[in-house]
Amino acid sequence: MIEFKNVSKHFGPTQVLHNIDLNIAQGEVVVIIGPSGSGKSTLLRCINKLEEITSGDLIVDGLKVNDPKVDERLIRQEAGMVFQQFYLFPHLTALENVMFGPLRVRGANKEEAEKLARELLAKVGLAERAHHYPSELSGGQQQRVAIARALAVKPKMMLFDEPTSALDPELRHEVLKVMQDLAEEGMTMVIVTHEIGFAEKVASRLIFIDKGRIAEDGNPQVLIKNPPSQRLQEFLQHVS
């Protein structure tokens, strides 16, 4: 479903991804960890073309992301994304935020979009907050609206870029619960996070990126309980 073939990425003279080879299959829940500046968020953002790769090939659901003829909007319909900051429209209610994608991207009529939006708000536990504005919601509630909004365009995969790092500790669990539910439903997910407990419990695969390279790739329970390298062991001790 997602295939990196010898992918590198530069920002000016600085190389942030080095010759990445990676395959992610449908239904996998892949958690990517690594220190700040390691390239993990850049890798994630390349998947739906928020960042352009410098060399190599990147295939997402049969679409060659680095082909200039491929419409980036088509890629982003297939790969929903949730960011560290919620990026909700402040002048729209929770319901209207979730309706936005079906109306503008999928061309749904208003009745269809509202029905879907209400279903998704219920799915993330916010049916009773449908008519609240973002300023009236907690950070955890805003992030759950953001997840519902990403799901509203019916993507084939979901990308999460540190979705809990801006939240107070007591609010993180409600977002992680929604993500766990999605994983159990079989959604293909690629998640950049420092939530090691979540990775161990929910992920089917754990990738450790260091200095722009994939340093470890394997079973989360094995890598977390018995780190095969000193570098991973040091990182896990730092974030635990």
UniProtKB/Swiss-Prot annotation:
Which SMART domains does the record cross-reference, listed alphabetically? AAA
Mainly localized where?
membrane
Q: What does the record give under GO molecular function?
A: ABC-type amino acid transporter activity; ATP binding; ATP hydrolysis activity; L-glutamine transmembrane transporter activity
Q: Which residues form a coiled coil?
A: none
Pfam annotation, one family: ABC_tran
Which stretches make up the ABC transporter domain? 2-236
| InterPro entries (alphabetical) | AAA+_ATPase, ABC_ATPase_HisP-typ, ABC_transporter-like_ATP-bd, ABC_transporter-like_CS, MetN_ABC_transporter-like, P-loop_NTPase
Q: Write out the GO cellular component annotations.
A: ATP-binding cassette (ABC) transporter complex, substrate-binding subunit-containing; membrane; plasma membrane
Question: What biological process terms from GO does the record include?
Answer: glutamine transport; L-glutamine import across plasma membrane
Cited CDD domains: ABC_HisP_GlnQ
Q: Where does ATP bind?
A: G34, P35, S36, G37, S38, G39, K40, S41
> Does the record's keyword annotation contain Cytoplasm?
no
Q: What is its membrane topology?
A: Peripheral membrane protein
Q: Which UniProt keywords apply?
A: Amino-acid transport, ATP-binding, Cell inner membrane, Cell membrane, Membrane, Nucleotide-binding, Transport
Cellular localization per UniProt: Cell inner membrane
Q: What induces it?
A: By lack of glutamine.
What does this protein do, in the record's words? Part of the binding-protein-dependent transport system for glutamine. Probably responsible for energy coupling to the transport system.
**Quaternary structure, from the entry:** Heterotetramer with 2 subunits of GlnQ and 2 subunits of GlnP.
* Family from the record: Belongs to the ABC transporter superfamily.
Kindly provide the name given to this protein in its UniProt entry: Glutamine transport ATP-binding protein GlnQ
Gene assigned in the entry: glnQ
